[in-house]
């Protein structure tokens, strides 16, 4: 399968067809295999890439940098305090400046409209490293990881549940990705934390074409039954007020992934996924604060699940690099 994605932006999965997404997943697997075999070809030699981070990051930044270096490209990191974007210079103007200097631009920040504006005016490929609404590079990594742990199933044969805050960028993006790839997704969350109705409707329309099944439920037992994968994310996202914790913890505690929830799947081969970072113990500053305030050593997932044989979170994290590399190679490579 081969598609010409050269000079395309990668802003959200809604912009891509099922076959284009599958192509990117296949390219990711090929590039991963080549890296391990030491046979990787540098198709981005001589390219210059700008990485704009208005929100801090570990995995996304490292994945973009290593992927670029592996492919022979040079990168410039522009951090939260390292530019005039939105302060003295509009994104429209910034896009037109950087587009003259760089061959590709990554953006990680706030509203989806910002990265869309960047993509409209830059004149070079723009890649969404995360916005408040969508996190498309993460979904490619998730689906590659699912394929690697599928026990012979294709994506369209898989069932997975996302538990927790289903209205955040991960809930949105997993729903879109599942709809595109014909998967059975269950969004298991308090009703107030379901995705926006317009996005659900859009995904349901896509599902009619792909055979996907989208279920929104508040019932954990119903939502996880028969799942191949269980997925969660932090309960309070970057940029949200600290005051949100009390209400969020009270609402979300029933949706914690623990060993009881693992057993409720009825699947001894079920796997646990998380985009990271995760609050699974009290070994971080925030983790200690949570343990002291709420008497919980883990929030969205317990330590015994996170460190168990069910967990594939570090395979998932590594795959950020391989899938991001595929996006850059497909849209920018020679």
Curated annotation (Swiss-Prot):
Top-level division of the source organism's lineage: Bacteria
Underlying gene: argF
GO process terms (BP): arginine biosynthetic process via ornithine; citrulline biosynthetic process; L-arginine biosynthetic process
InterPro entries: Asp/Orn_carbamoyltranf_P-bd, Asp/Orn_carbamoylTrfase, Asp/Orn_carbamoylTrfase_sf, Asp_carbamoyltransf_Asp/Orn-bd, Orn/put_carbamltrans, OTCase_ArgI
The family this protein is said to belong to: Belongs to the aspartate/ornithine carbamoyltransferase superfamily. OTCase family.
Organism: Vibrio parahaemolyticus serotype O3:K6 (strain RIMD 2210633)
GO molecular-function terms, A-Z: amino acid binding; ornithine carbamoyltransferase activity
A matching Pfam family: OTCace
EC number: 2.1.3.3
Pathway assigned to this chain's UniProt record: Amino-acid biosynthesis; L-arginine biosynthesis; L-arginine from L-ornithine and carbamoyl phosphate: step 1/3
Gene3D superfamilies: Aspartate/ornithine carbamoyltransferase (3.40.50.1370)
Residue sites binding L-ornithine per the record: 169, 233, 237-238
Cellular localisation: Cytoplasm
Protein name per the record: Ornithine carbamoyltransferase
Keyword vocabulary terms for this entry: Amino-acid biosynthesis, Arginine biosynthesis, Cytoplasm, Transferase
Free-text function comment from the UniProt entry: Reversibly catalyzes the transfer of the carbamoyl group from carbamoyl phosphate (CP) to the N(epsilon) atom of ornithine (ORN) to produce L-citrulline.
GO cellular component labels: cytoplasm
